[in-house]
Every structure is written in structure tokens, then in C-alpha cells.
Amino acid sequence: MQPLPVEFYARQTTLVAKELLGTLLVHNSDEGITVGKIVETEAYLQGDPACHAARRMTPRNSVMFGPPGRAYVYFTYGMHYCFNVVTASEGVGEAVLIRAVEPLKGLELMRKRRGRERLHELCAGPARLVQAFGITKEHNTKELTSGPLYIAVSSEPSPEIHTTTRIGIKEGADLPLRFYIKDNKFISKK
């Protein structure tokens, strides 16, 4: 599987968020390989009140201001990690949250990591997919164009995309920056 090049990420964030739909999230860990089709994303933009980089650069969000095509993994609600992809130009401070993935390969490993059997419960939500794929804070700042964690080109045709508002935020909740593959049963919420 061919990783997406850095140029893919170095573009307008909402475009990247849409075009990530249908691509493959791949993690080749010591435990085994997991692969899933990205089916739901959210864009977080400079000046967007819900974006971690909206106010200023901090040690936590500094990766968002770095080169595109890197992982931004952060801890939220004191219990879960979330996986984002840094986008746009260096210095901008934007990213795409990967909200849901359709599990394709490494299902038994995903079930073991999640402690769940039902396929829909493995990766339908940002915290679930991070756990199922074994993504940790150690992946923060890592390049997604090479290495064990990457996003790959898919041979499937471009999916039909549905656009709506983001989930689980207060500020910027009215912005239409959530994208998902229409009629896909593995999205986190309709």
C-alpha cells in the first residue's frame, strides 16, 4: 500500500478532510497490522474557535504549526486519545480529526484491543479507532508518509460525501466541517 505524499496534506484543510474519505489508515505495529477505510473526518481551521491552534501555539498543539502530513495525537476528557492529521502550510495551525474508520484487516487484533466483538463497535468514533489501531501519544508528531502508521491511497472510486456540523464541541458547533461517506454504517453518528 502506497502512503499518501506530503503534498496531499499541504493543501486547504477542508479539501484534505473530504479527500481523506475512502483512503486507508494503516498501522503496522509489533502486534500485527490493522487497516481500515476512513469514513468520517472533521476539519479544524485557523481562527476556528474549536481548533486547538485558534489562540496561539502551545507545547500541546505545536505539531499543528509544523510540517503537514504529521500525526497530532492528544489526550481528551482525561481518558481518551484522538488522532489528527496536520494539514495546510507550515505555520498555519490546522488539522483533520479522523472520526471513524471501517475495519478491513486485523479485526481480531482490533477486537482484542477494544474488548469488543461487534464490528461496528471497533472504530466508530475517534477514541474507539485510536484504541483499535493501537495509536498512542508516542505517535504524536510522527510523519504519516512513511513508518508504521500511515494513510494509503485506495483503489476504490471516490465516495459520495455528506457534509454536516461537527460533533461534541460547543464553540464553532454550527460550522459545516464534518464529512462522512454517505450511507456508510461505520460512521460514529448520523
From Swiss-Prot:
Domain of life: Bacteria
A Pfam family recorded for this sequence: Pur_DNA_glyco
CDD domains: AAG (cd00540)
Keywords: DNA damage, DNA repair, Hydrolase
EC nos: 3.2.2.-
UniProt-listed SUPFAM superfamilies: FMT C-terminal domain-like
Enzyme class: hydrolase
InterPro entries with a match to the protein in the record: Formyl_transferase-like_C_sf, MPG, MPG_sf
GO molecular function: alkylbase DNA N-glycosylase activity; DNA binding
GO terms classed as biological process: base-excision repair
Family statement: Belongs to the DNA glycosylase MPG family.
Record's protein name: Putative 3-methyladenine DNA glycosylase
Organism: Desulforamulus reducens (strain ATCC BAA-1160 / DSM 100696 / MI-1) (Desulfotomaculum reducens)
